Amino acid sequence: MVHNFVNYQVISLSITASIWAIKVLFPCTLVLGIIVLFLRWYVRKRSKNALPDLRFVPRTRQDIRPVVVGFFHPYCNAGGGGERVLWTGIRALQNRYKFVRCVVYTGDSCVSGDEILRKARQRFNISLPEPVEFVFLKRRRWVEASTYPYFTLLGQSIGSVLLGWEALTSYLPDVFVDTMGYAFTLPLFRYLGGCQVGCYVHYPTISTDMLTRVGSKKTSYNNASLISNSQILSTMKLVYYYLFAITYGLAGSCAQVVMVNSTWTYRHILSLWKRKEQTSIVYPPCDTNAFIELPINIGKIGERGGDNDKEDSADCIHSIVSVGQFRPEKDHPLQLRSFHQFLKCKMAKDRHKYKLILVGSCRNKEDQDRVKSLRQLAFDLEIESCVEFALNVSFEQLKKNLAKATIGLHTMWNEHFGIGVVECMASGCIVLAHDSGGPKMDIVVEWDGNPTGFLANDEKSYAAAMETIFALSPEEKSVICHNARQSVTRFSETAFENGFLQCTEPLFISV
């Protein structure tokens, strides 16, 4: 009897809870649905008369309905690897589909569309077969890190929603592709715009590695010592990161097609977005042709000679070249300290035969200040005479530096891919890269069963690898260099275009 009474009470409570849930959830769902429908109507009304030429169909081609693809790339005039992905992807779509019209949402309002396309031709040698329209966004500052000195991830993400709303209400495409990693624009265009949605992710906005580093209280460029030395602040930041990661995962899960640039990015995006069936690795296009043309002249005086070479004369310089912007995450101090560790094992009379050349661009005062501090570090380590800073060099000068170098050096922890590493391999350098991220998982891997370079993770291992490389015979160096050069065909523009077209095809089937 008591047992039946308890069961009755439980059933009654369950029914009551269900009724209250229906009473609360149904009106909320109804209101949310009405809001979404209203915003969809508002978006279509706002962008109805924008760029009418994109929807124009000639009388002779009434059988073709144009499909407009919008690319969200607020910094499309930057001239970096992300922009090469953008323009190569657009060219691939235009060559494949004659009915495709392309729009680029950009914040580069200080230049014209013609100037942007001209720079793409000059920088990447990419000419588009069809015209491209530009929607110039006025509020790009909302996604700039400098706008948010604190809670930068949160600020930039909210800013990307606002910038995405400006893009959405300026012009509504049929297909939306984010090529810069602004995941919070994806639900906007899918649910409020009714678009087919895809994205190309260069690196996750937040990763499990970032969570681990904060949890272990390690100091880094994005985890200040003030926080890492405080248990309370570290816990607060960890909670903030976890909440942000959940929100980021929900936004990313709205994508119907996800392309990532490396195995490292793939694993992190998969753990956050949970879209395994929709996610594919498409290596970014690397222009290796100009570097492959450089001869592999192992054994010439001053050009990739080794400690075992007969030309080890007073005027023979064995150079190590590092290529990368002077940003904190590139970890140039590790390069200097590793080089110092390597030189300590050399006789004083032989140290002048080795040179570390840091090639990179100085974009602003922050970069200049970092270079100044690096010069000071080289002075403090007493290696300033063996270190050269090549700032803002021309492409021709870059090729000359790589042509003479024995080692191509890379020290960034968990770099998502590593185009600079690919360029060093293509040029004939022996690569010494960080044992993490894209270089470890995708680039400096065995090719046809043979090594393509070396990996290290701290001063001691970098110095030891430098010693090993310089001690190789010319024949051993030649085998590694030729093998590495053959392996970079995986990262060609043709390989990227094929992968990009295969991944984006479902977006056009559903339009």
Protein language model regions, located:
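Short alpha-helical donor nucleotide-sugar binding micro-motif in glycosyltransferases
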Residues: 392, 400-405
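Nucleotide-activated donor-binding/catalytic signature segment of Leloir-type glycosyltransferases, i.e.
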Residues: 125-128, 368-396
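Membrane-proximal helix-turn-helix segments that form the acceptor-binding/catalytic region
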Residues: 165-166, 205, 217, 221-258, ...
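Aromatic "clamp/platform" in nucleotide-sugar-dependent glycosyltransferases that forms part
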Residues: 413
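Conserved donor-binding/catalytic core segment of Leloir-type glycosyltransferases
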Residues: 71, 259, 299-330, 336-341, ...
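A charged, aromatic-enriched C-terminal amphipathic alpha-helix characteristic of glycosyltransferases
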Residues: 457, 471-511
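A conserved mid-protein helix/loop that constitutes part of the nucleotide-sugar donor-binding site
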Residues: 80-88, 318, 325-347, 369-372
